[in-house]
From Swiss-Prot:
Bias (Basic residues): 407-419
Compositional bias segments (type: Pro residues): 175-186
Superkingdom of origin organism: Eukaryota
An example Gene Ontology biological process: DNA repair
Domain notes: The DBINO region is involved in binding to DNA.
Ranges of biased composition (kind: Basic and acidic residues): 101-113, 161-173, 420-429, 552-563
UniProt organism field: Cryptococcus neoformans var. neoformans serotype D (strain B-3501A)
Helicase ATP-binding domain: residues covered: 883-1055
Protein name in the entry: Chromatin-remodeling ATPase INO80
Function text: ATPase component of the INO80 complex which remodels chromatin by shifting nucleosomes and is involved in DNA repair.
């Protein structure tokens, strides 16, 4: 592309073409822009490399590389010659064009002239652009390589005088003035405009006007570069600009007034001078100086003339030439070389003074007229002089850097702040003499250039984006305001391009060129630049990174006003002379001044002199050139590719020939075949040996690397293990210290609180041993009275004393916090106007940790008088304990065993507070939904003076109730509308925001195990309620783990029990492992400390210690064997369980295992539990029937109705036939009257004429031969009897026939015709009355056969086969007519036939009148009908098969045992509570109870609250109810069922606390009978092991609460052991010993990727019995639903998910599976048994299974009998 760009300039100028004229501001001129057509492109003259191939071939001895290099050199030389020729041709053409367009003629008269205005030159067009671009030249000189001389740039006087008056001014008569000072070109342009107007007289060619202050454009604004794009328009524009520049330069040079010595007219800036010196090599370019990157310009902006360039000297070329020729006179600013300092006569720019003069002015403090660059140029030399003087005084040592160089002065110029102060003094002092050059144009330019750096802008227009420009606030309020660039508004930016030069000079301030002075800006108040807040981080104007900056928006507004004021001031200055300028003569000059004041139209062109249309044209030209370039590239690429392809082929041929020549020269004429035969054998052996050596080396190094890796890994592993062991030892020691600290702190707190509230005395009872507390003196606490600060607590140190002091202080803080909280609550109650409680016994202030012996000050409470009951001794102690809790302001847990009266004790506490402390509320009681009514009844019964408000029901009802208790600022007294609010847990969570608005005196949580999960929303919501004290009532404080105990303890004392991790570190792991039979490290002293910590907060008594009159509780386990059907299904499940998969699942389901695997395992457990309960839970033996094509209506319960139920009309065919109307109503039926019918004609026509069954017709036809009624004579019937029989119904015919046969049998003669008698059917035959003669005492044969048939299975209804696979009712016609429906019903349902078949109705059987009437209608038919009286074999087979009810009992062993047990209990007068885990099992039991006709009640999670209350009341009051069916979770909480004396658990819970609560519903206070508890357990199944696991959990509770010591309790370590019975375990152990005797070692099973998990094939439908043991979240949701009556417990949530367990699939283990070659099935079983034994024994962790082969999925299909097929 570079060659193509250079080549474009060598072509002759093409023909130009006009385009659309652009808008011009002058109304009389039309402006045409020229655009260049597409230039023709010559193909490049590349020399193909193939042209040199011939010469290469002719010189075989010459190196091809040398030839190719020579070829490339020749090509490069030819290309350079061509470029030089093109450049010379271009320069010649440009000289001719410039000569043809002189400014004297064409510039003035051309109507298409481009408006003149000064704009900065683009960077891309300047000398700093790409140097390969050919620049225009003039007079044979290139501006880049050879700068023009001053004579070429500065016009002569003759050229100046030839400048015409501006054509935009009207002509005026101006007398010639003395030529003292030439006018600026702007004034000349205005005069020329007036001279061209038709009415104006001829004006002299030159008008000399002098302005006091003005600004000039830069002389170096050439628009050069890419002239072939813009063509003639750009050429004329450039010619005009060059002429204007010459005129301005000459005029400015002649305006030098009072110049200083050696002061140049237009000095260079410091940057330009340094740049020239760097080019000339005078100074070295520093390498460590970071230069700021300039902003890159867009090519489109450059071509459109919208790019700006940094300012430069107006005559940069001339000054560059002068600098080059006279460098010794006009030296450049730059760094000082201490070894070779600059001459004092060197000129300093931009001031133009010598270095000596500048230094003298700076030292004298007179820096007027100097800029920052001037001061910077000499500051180093001044600093060195000063340091040299100091060094002379100190011994001649200059300050140097570390590298030995002389240190320079850093920072800005020394006199810069002085300059700012002097400028201010200069501007503010009236009458002070101005600068010597202030009155001249050149002086103005020089001053403006000097002030440009001083008034540099605050914002840098080319600064990096995002870089913050630091600014400095002016020190004095009257300081000089900064100048801003680009501050013109849109009006000034779009002024006409042909406006006078004065306006252009005024607009100069708004561009990125030279910025001069502005009196308007100087006279603005200092407020125009608002002061910054931080002076230390701001910079003064002109000290920024860029030379010119851009002002902010507020500053732009000020500059706009300043520019307008400056314009008016500048114009006004032309009206009269001043002291520093030559005056203008009177007369016409005044008119000129008036014209100068004229306001011109706004500018509408681009600021650079390019209009919008011209910019569009330029943009189109750019696009055309780009398209042309790309088209040339696309055209030339294939050709160049072919050229280089040919060159490549030629080079390949040369290389090939050269190789062939080398081969020929190397071997010569020797016989190559002989050498090959001799070397073949050697090469073959050498190759083999080399391969073997390489293989051995590779093997050696592989082994070596492997050994190194193994050794390195071993060393790293050992180092890691050592580091881990050390870290574990440190962490163990640290945790031990932390545990000791926490225990000490809690012990001190518990010790004091326990003595205050007397927990020990409350627990003491007859027959109960209470351990003496260890005396602990307060001297051990070591808390100083002075309160000196203790050292920081560090658990890594061994300072036990410091730990104990911190623990004591922490306990004291906790006590103080409890005291402050209670006091604050009481103060808030008093502040609301509540009555002061009688706090005679309250000693909150005495709660001092330093005085622990306050036992004598504790409160002794008697029974309240308002309590309408007599408390027992242990209950009164419990009331005293609760009262002391309130007195001390702490919370507690009343954990008495279920049935000891926790409710009455809490009620008595509320009565005590109301009676002794005058605290009538508000109290909040939260209980499960099933006990809400019980609480309401107990409060109304025992404390009628306390008003209880039940808060439950619909949202609307609760909103009404809230109006009662949620009043603001209400006080509570005996007359208050309520005292106690009773609600459930679910409603408390829902209405939390309302309950938080009240401050409750006491909050009582009944059955507090409902908040055992600290992560539940219920726990968090209740913890946030505002209450003074909390009391938790629970019979089982320990549920599943110690985590639940921590949740309760944190709820009552969050200050101490604030971290569950710490609590678990204390006790959880040790106690749980100890109760599980695993060796734990729970020490007796730790257990003792745990009891001591829990004792003050928890009061627990058991029944055997405190209630002597309460009857005993006997628990009996009833072990049953599975039925045949259960055994088959259980065996089928076991066969599909692999022991290997069992162990793998156990290994994967650790605490951090996969939850999906855990869910699969638990689901498999639930399948086994279903089998043990009842096989119908898998698939119910449903009613079986053929496919019926029809619809059925709703019917009753088929199981209850029995086999005699028959609904013939319940079925209806899906096909319906619509009868046309004409067939029934419009004459179709002869017996239906109508308008067009023939009613009455049926008697004549149908009954007589068309009836063949009339007696006359029969009699007539019997006389004819071959007549159809010939049989009448044979059967012995008369024509009348035959006619009557034909017209009678079928049933009447059958009855008459049966009666005739009976008479004939009884009265007729004997006929010896065996064949005829055998062929007669015996259906519906009436038993014979003829006596059968038999031997006396013998049974007749008929009776024997009947009895055998009745006792056989084939006689049963369920054994009779169904003949059809599909049946369909009859298709009934349909007509929309009432009479049609009545007739149809009368025909289908004949009363006579119905009565004969089914007999009389049950209500008419004993009615003599109905019996007599029935005998007349149907003689010899029993009153019960033919079907009930006939044998079962004669009745029609029913298509509906209903399973017998007895099968429901027989198929389940547990239900069969329950059936016999209930018979015994019913006979003994007992009443039974029957508990279940599954609601579907409760449905089956309901059918059984209905079958046995036992009266029962059912309560589960779906029972509403109101029904629960009614059911409990009915059970307690109605002794006729024998069985109460309950779910363990819904019916085992807080209800009193003491009317029962027997409890039966059909299946038991994972959680032993749930079963304990359930059985205590009957064994509680008020029970006078002995309570017997039965558990139905299937022997040898998973249920037996689940029961053992639950009892192991019960031991945790006993260990924690102190009723049992640490001991080994039998518990399986893994759930896997649940699936193996004792026999299998013993057999596995024997096989393991046998395998070990043969040398077998059990393999290590390593997990490999994703295995087929245990129970993957099962349908994850654990709705039946997922009681939440493994899923705490599901259990919590189930509890919530049960409590609120929102649905059944967790097992009911699975309804509808899985229809039957017959579709459950299981993985089938592969037949070919062995972990070791030659290992058989017995060895595998022995190995698995050995591993399982080690797991159960706790000596080894369970091993994972290797990845088994793919398994098939099989489906268990159950047959009609319920057994697997």
């Amino acid at each position: 592309m570079g060659a193509m760009d250079d080549r474009r300039y060598s072509y002759p100028p093409p023909r130009t073409s006009y385009v659309q004229p652009s808008t011009h501001p002058s109304p009389t001129a039309s402006d045409y822009r020229y655009r260049s057509p597409v230039l023709p492109q010559h193909p490049p003259t590349h020399h193909s490399p193939s042209s040199y191939s011939a010469s290469l071939y002719g010189q075989p001895k010459e190196d091809p590389a040398i030839a190719y290099a020579r070829m490339r050199e020749e090509m490069r030389t030819a290309e350079e010659a061509r470029r030089e020729a093109e450049a010379l041709e271009y320069r010649r053409k440009r000289d001719m064009e410039f000569a043809a367009r002189r400014p004297g003629s064409e510039l003035m008269d051309d109507p298409r002239r481009i408006p003149h205005s000064s704009f900065p030159r683009s960077q891309m067009y300047g000398p700093s652009a790409d140097q390969s671009r050919v620049m225009p030249s003039r007079n044979g000189k290139d501006y880049i390589s050879e700068p023009p001389s001053p004579s070429e740039l500065y016009p002569t006087d003759e050229d100046t005088e030839r400048l015409p008056i501006d054509r935009y001014r009207r002509d005026i008569d101006v007398p010639p003035l003395p030529r003292q000072l030439p006018p600026p070109p702007s004034e000349i342009g205005r005069m020329a405009d007036r001279a061209r107007s038709p009415s104006a007289p001829i004006a002299p060619p030159l008008l000399k006007v002098v302005r006091k202050r003005t600004k000039v454009i830069r002389p170096n604004d050439f628009l050069v570069g890419n002239e072939d794009v813009w063509e003639d328009g750009l050429i004329r524009y450039q010619s005009k600009r060059e002429d204007e520049v010459r005129a301005i330069a000459q005029w400015a040079a002649s305006c030098q007034v009072r110049n200083g010595v050696g002061e140049p007219s237009l000095p260079q800036t410091q940057d330009e001078s340094i740049k020239v010196r760097k080019i000339n090599g005078d100074i070295a370019t520093p390498t460590n100086k970071k230069k700021r990157k300039s902003r890159k310009l867009n090519l489109d902006d450059e071509l459109l003339g919208l790019a700006s360039s940094p300012p430069g000297s107006p005559n940069a070329a001339a000054e560059a030439e002068k600098s080059e020729s006279k460098h010794h006179i006009y030296g450049m600013n730059g760094p000082i070389d201490p070894a070779n300092p600059p001459s004092p006569s060197t000129i300093v720019y931009p001031s133009g003074l010598t270095r000596a003069e500048v230094i003298a002015k700076c030292e004298a403090g007179d820096v007027e007229g100097l800029t920052e660059d001037d001061v910077k140029a000499v500051q180093d030399e001044m600093w060195m002089r000063e340091k040299a003087a100091q060094a002379a005084e100190n011994g001649g040592v200059l300050p140097t850097n570390k590298d030995g160089t002389v240190r320079r002065k850093p920072g800005p110029a020394k006199g810069w702040r002085k300059i700012r102060g002097i400028d201010k003094k200069k501007e503010t002092t009236p009458g002070k003499a101005q600068s010597t050059t202030a009155g001249s144009v050149a002086g103005s330019v020089a001053d403006e250039e000097a002030e440009a750096d001083i008034a540099a802008l605050l914002d840098d227009s080319i600064a990096k984006k995002g870089k913050k420009v630091k600014r400095r606030k002016l020190e004095e309020p009257g300081a000089e305001s900064p100048r801003f660039a680009d501050a013109e508004d849109e009006y000034n930016e779009h002024r006409p391009s042909d406006s006078v030069l004065l306006d252009e000079i005024e607009d100069e301030h708004s561009r990125a060129g030279s910025v001069g002075e502005s009196n308007a800006l100087d006279t603005l108040p200092a407020a125009s630049a608002p002061p910054k807040k931080k002076n230390s981080k701001t910079k003064e104007p002109g000290v920024g990174k860029g030379r010119w900056t851009r002002p902010t928006k507020p500053e732009k507004e000020l500059v706009k006003k300043a520019e307008a004021l400056a314009s008016r001031t500048s114009k006004a200055s032309l009206a009269g002379p001043s002291d520093d300028t030559f005056g203008v003569g009177p007369g016409p000059a005044e008119e000129v001044q008036e014209e100068i004041k004229h306001e011109y139209a706004p500018n509408t062109h681009d600021p650079r002199g390019v209009s919008e249309n011209e910019a569009k044209i330029r943009h189109e030209l750019v696009e055309d050139l780009q398209k042309q370039a790309w088209s040339n590239i696309v055209r030339d690429v294939p050709r160049i590719y072919r050229v280089f392809q040919g060159y490549d082929q030629s080079m390949k041929q040369i290389a090939q020939r050269r190789a062939q020549a080398c081969v020929r020269n190397a071997f010569g004429q020797r016989n190559q075949k002989t050498m090959q035969r001799q070397s073949g054998k050697v090469n073959k052996e050498g190759a083999a040996k080399a391969k073997r050596i390489v293989k051995e080396l590779a093997a050696f190094w592989r082994k070596n690397e492997k050994d190194e890796v193994i050794a390195r890994k071993k060393a790293e592993r050992e180092a890691l293990e050592r580091a881990k062991a050390e870290e574990e030892a440190r962490e163990t020691k640290r945790q031990s210290r932390k545990l000791n600290f926490l225990l000490t702190q809690t012990e001190l707190y518990s010790h004091f609180i326990g003595k205050k509230i007397k927990t020990k005395e409350a627990e003491a009872a007859e027959g109960m041993d209470v351990e003496e507390e260890e005396k602990r003196g307060m001297e051990e606490i070591a808390i100083g009275e002075d309160g000196e600060p203790l050292p920081d607590l560090d658990y890594d140190e061994d300072d036990e004393e410091n730990l104990r002091k911190h623990a004591a202080r922490g306990a004291q803080a906790a006590i103080q916090a409890a005291r402050d909280k209670a006091r604050a609550f009481d103060d808030s109650i008093v502040g609301r106007g509540a009555p002061l409680p009688g706090d005679d016994t309250m000693d909150g202030d005495e709660l001092n940790f330093q005085n622990p012996s306050l036992g004598e000050n504790s409160v002794t409470i008697t029974q309240p008088k308002m309590l309408m009951a007599q408390l027992k001794e242990y209950q009164l102690k419990g009331l005293t304990w609760l009262g002391n809790l309130y007195e001390q302001g702490i919370n507690g847990i009343l954990a008495d065993e279920m049935g000891l009266g926790k409710t009455i004790q809490s009620i008595s506490l509320l009565a005590y507070l109301a009676e002794h402390h005058n605290l009538w509320g508000p109290f909040l009681v939260i209980a499960p939904a099933s006990t809400l009514h019980n609480w309401q009844q107990e409060l109304a019964r025992f404390v009628p003076r306390l008003k209880a408000l039940p808060y439950w029901g619909s949202p609307k009802d609760r909103e009404t109730l809230r109006k009662i208790w949620s009043r603001k600022n209400q006080t509570f007294s005996e007359d208050s509308p309520f005292h106690i609010l009773i609600t459930s847990y679910q409603l408390a969570v829902q209405d939390e925001k309302y309950l938080q608005g009240m401050k409750w005196q006491y909050m009582i949580l009944d059955e507090a195990q409902a908040i055992k999960s600290s992560s539940s929303a219920r726990w968090k919501s209740l913890l946030s309620l505002h209450c003074r004290n909390r009391l938790l009532l629970t019979g089982t404080p320990i549920q599943n783990s110690m985590h639940e105990l921590w949740a309760l303890l944190h709820f009552i004392m969050p200050q101490l029990f604030d971290s569950h991790e710490e609590f678990a570190e204390w006790f959880s792991k040790d106690i749980e492992s100890s109760s599980g039979g695993v060796t734990g490290n729970l020490k007796p002293e730790q257990l003792k400390r745990l009891h001591m910590i829990l004792k003050p907060f928890m009061l627990r008594r058991v029944k055997k210690h405190v209630q002597k009159e309460l009857g005993d509780k006997i628990e009996i386990d009833l072990l049953v064997d599975l039925s045949q059907r259960q055994r088959e299904i259980y065996k089928a499940l076991r066969q599909r369980v692999s022991i290997t998969d069992l162990l793998a699942t156990a290994e994967n389901n650790t605490d951090n295992g996969n939850p999906k695997n855990m869910r699969s395992l638990v689901n498999l457990v639930m399948q086994f539990r279903k089998v043990c309960n009842h096989p119908d839970l898998f698939e119910r033996a449903d009613v079986v029937s053929p496919f019926v094509f029809g619809e059925f209506s709703q019917s009753g319960n088929l199981a209850r109705e029995g086999d005699g139920m028959y609904l013939p009309d319940s079925a209806r065919n899906a096909i319906e036939v619509q009868i046309p109307r004409i067939l029934w109503t419009d004459g179709g039926k002869l017996d239906i009257p109508g308008e067009q019918s023939l009613a009455g004609s049926d008697t004549k026509i149908l009954q007589n004429l068309l009836n063949i069954w009339t007696p006359e017709w029969i009699n007539e036809r019997t006389k004819c031969a071959d007549a159809e009624f010939g049989f009448v004579k044979l059967v012995g019937s008369s024509p009348g009897e035959t006619s009557r029989s034909a017209k009678s119904p079928v049933l009447v015919q059958l009855l008459e026939g049966a009666e005739k046969e009976r008479r004939w049998t009884e009265e007729g003669r004997f006929v010896d015709d065996s064949e005829f008698a055998a062929s007669v059917k015996k259906g519906f035959r009436v038993p014979s009355v003829i006596p059968v003669l038999t031997q006396p005492g013998q049974v007749s044969l008929r009776e024997i056969s009947r009895r055998v048939w009745d006792e056989s299975y084939l006689s049963r209804d369920d054994a009779r086969c169904i003949g059809d696979y599909a049946i369909a009712p009859i298709v009934k016609p349909i007509a929309s007519n009432r009479s049609f429906l009545n007739a149809q019903d009368r025909i289908l349902n004949q009363p006579l036939a119905h009565s004969t078949l089914y007999g009389l109705a049950p209500s008419e059987l004993h009615d003599p009148l109905a019996a007599e009437q029935f005998s007349r209608i149907a003689p010899s038919v029993p009153l019960t009908g033919l079907i009930p009286s006939s044998a079962s074999s004669q009745t029609p087979v029913s298509p509906l098969h209903i399973p017998p009810t007895k099968r429901l009992i027989v198929d389940s062993a547990k239900l069969a045992r329950l059936d016999s047990l209930l018979r015994e209990l019913k006979a003994g007068g007992h009443r039974v509570l029957l508990y279940f885990q599954m609601t579907k099992m409760m449905d089956l039991i309901e059918e059984y109870l209905i079958f046995r006709q036992y009266k029962y009640l059912r309560l589960d999670g779906s029972s509403p609250i109101a029904e629960r209350r009614d059911m409990v009341t009915s059970w307690q009051t109605n002794p006729d109810i024998f069985v109460f069916c309950l779910s363990t979770r819904a019916g085992g909480l807080g209800i009193n069922l003491t009317a029962a004396d027997t409890v039966i658990f059909y299946d038991h819970d994972w959680n032993p606390s749930s079963d304990a609560q359930a059985m205590d519903r009957a064994h509680r206070v008020g029970q006078t009978k002995q309570v017997t508890v039965y558990r139905l357990v299937a022997r040898g199944t998973i249920e037996e092991r689940i029961l053992q696991m639950a009892r192991g959990k019960k031991d945790i509770q006993d260990v924690v609460v102190g009723t049992k010591s640490v001991s080994d309790v039998a518990k399986p370590s893994e759930i896997v052991s649940l699936f193996m019975d004792d026999e299998e375990l013993a057999e596995s152990v024997a096989k393991r010993k046998q395998a070990e005797a043969h040398g077998y070692i059990a393999p290590t099973i390593i997990p490999n990727g994703r295995r087929s998990q245990f129970g993957d094939g099962l349908v994850l439908d654990d709705g039946e019995g997922d009681d939440g043991f493994f899923n705490a979240a599901a259990a919590a949701r189930a509890n919530a639903e049960e409590e609120e009556g929102l649905g059944a417990e967790e097992e009911s949530k699975g309804k509808g998910k899985a229809k039957a367990a017959a579709a459950v699939t299981f993985p089938v283990p592969g037949e070919k599976r062995s972990h070791k070659k030659g290992m058989g099935k017995k060895a595998q079983a022995a190995a698995a048994a050995a591993a399982l034994e080690r797991v159960i024994a706790g000596n080894e962790e369970p091993l994972a299974a290797s990845k088994p082969p793919a398994k098939k999925k099989v489906k268990i299909a159950l047959g009609p009998d319920g057994l697997p097929l």
